[in-house]
Regions:
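PLP-dependent amino-acid enzyme catalytic core
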Residues: 1-191
């Protein structure tokens, strides 16, 4: 669906490799060979700032009784941007990063206190299946989040089902991470 949507807007789509790292390496090779511009999908200050506008929208829609925000994480651009904005404007709001257990590169990095490259990642939540958190995103995230929640494939599937039952929309697995994290947090905190 994503690829077709991009093609429908007139872009030439080049699919290469089975992992994000393989696709990124190929894109950088094309940049060198053909003089193209490479815009990193998450580890770029402008991309992070752009994704931070989601945090602005959240605060506009919920100006008062907002206690916590749960953000899906792959490479970390969305999480870094949203967390930086919300913590600057509303430092009282808790920020939780949510990852699939099979691609929990942020949780590993937070535990080791440095970026860690996972030997392999699962592809169920393919939109967030990244082996290593971004360098700039990790720098921002480690200063702005209150915790990392990892969720299983079963927890993600349950959240996809919940979203469908509530909205009649089918969420992709990465799109259901935040709800899965919220549900796990609520259960652990007996909320």
């Amino acid at each position: 669906i994503k690829v077709e949507a991009v093609k429908a807007r007139g872009a030439k789509v080049i699919l290469h490799g089975d992992t994000y790292d393989e696709a990124s390496a190929h894109a950088q090779q094309l940049m060198q060979e053909k003089g193209m511009t490479y815009v990193h999908p998450y580890d770029d200050p402008d991309v992070i700032a752009g994704q931070g506008t989601v945090g602005m929208e959240i605060l506009r829609q919920h100006p008062d009784n907002l206690h916590a925000v749960f953000i899906p994480v792959g490479g970390g651009g969305l999480c870094a941007g949203v967390a930086a904005y919300i913590k600057f404007v509303r430092p009282d709001v808790k920020i939780f990063a949510v990852e699939a257990e099979e691609s929990a590169c942020l949780a590993a990095a937070m535990q080791q206190k440095k970026r860690v490259k996972l030997p392999q990642v699962g592809l169920f939540a393919d939109g967030t299946a990244v082996a290593q958190i971004g360098e700039e995103t990790f720098r921002v995230i480690k200063k702005t989040i209150d915790g990392v929640i990892t969720v299983s494939t079963d927890e993600i599937c349950a959240s996809i089902k919940d979203i469908f039952e509530d909205t009649r929309s089918i969420a992709e697995p990465s799109g259901a991470l935040a709800l899965a994290g919220l549900k796990k947090y609520a259960a652990e905190q007996s909320l």
